[in-house]
Amino acid sequence: MPTTQAVPTTTEPLWAKVIDHTSCIGCHACTTACKSENEVPLSVTRTYVKYVDVGHWPEARRSFQVTRCNQCEDAPCVAACPTAAMYRRPDGIVDFDKSICIGCKACIAACPYDAIFINPEDNSAEKCNFCAHRLDVGLEPACVVVCPTQALMVGDMNDPLSQVSQVINRDAVTVRKPEKGTRPKVFYKGADQVTLDPLAARRPDGGLYMWSEQGDVSHQVPSGHPGQWNNSAAAVLSYDIPHRAPWDFRVSLYTFTKSISAGAYLVPLILAMTGMIPWTSTAWTLIGPIVAMVFLG
C-alpha cells in the first residue's frame, strides 16, 4: 500500500529580541560591542543604556534600560522614508540602505523610540538592525555575544522552541509605547516603568549626569519632556545620552529651497507647454534651469 510523506516546509524566521531587566547590570558592554562591530562613530550610538534612580534614601535603587530600535512590524520610519532607504525585511528586521538615504531625517522624526541617528561621517541614517549581517550567516548579534549576564536574547518567534519564544510565552514581558500601534519586536522583561516612559523621571539638577554634562538643553530633547517638567520626584535620570531634536531650521530651509528649485523649473515648462511663452524663451532655456540648480544645491 503506497504511503505519503509530508514534505518539510521552511518558514521564514521572525526575529525578535528580549531584554531581561532583572539581569542587566548596566555595564555598557552591548554599547561598546555594537560600536566596534558596526563601526559606529563617536557621539552617536545604535544602542545605549539609560540609568534611572528610583526611591528615597535609604530605600533607593537603580534601574537600567537598554534602548535601541524596536524592529516594529508597522514601522513609522519605513512609512516616512521618501526613498525607501528604511525598509522591513521578510524576517521582521527593519533595515536601512545607506546608498539611497538622502539624510532628510524624516525617519528620525517618525520614530517614537528615539532609535535613529544621522551618521556624522556620511550623513545617512543608521540604527540597530539586530546585526543582520551576522544573523544572515548564523551568528548572534554582537551585543548578545558579549552580554556578561545573558540579559539580551535574540531568536525566532516562529520557532516555539527558541529561547525568545519561550520567554515571551512564559514570562511577563512588555513593549515600549504599545499605544503607538507599531507592534514592536523588542520585548522587555522585568522593566521598571520609570525607565520605559521618558516622562516618568526628571533630569538631574543642572543637567549634570554621572559621567557627563549635556550641553545647552534649549537645543535638545533630553528625555522627551521639558527640562524642568517632572511627574515623579522619586525618579531621577542619572545617566543618559543627549537627544537632539531631529528637525530644526535646516529642514524647513531644505524644504523651502527645494520647492523654489522645482517651481523655477516647472513654471517656465508649464508656460511653454500652454503656449504662453515660446519654447526658445530664455525663461525656459536659461533662467529657469539656472535658478533651479542654484536652489537645488
What are these language model-derived features?
Residues 217-297:
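Hydrophobic cores of alpha-helical transmembrane segments in multi-pass integral membrane proteins
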Residues 1-247:
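Non-ligating segments of multi-cofactor redox enzymes
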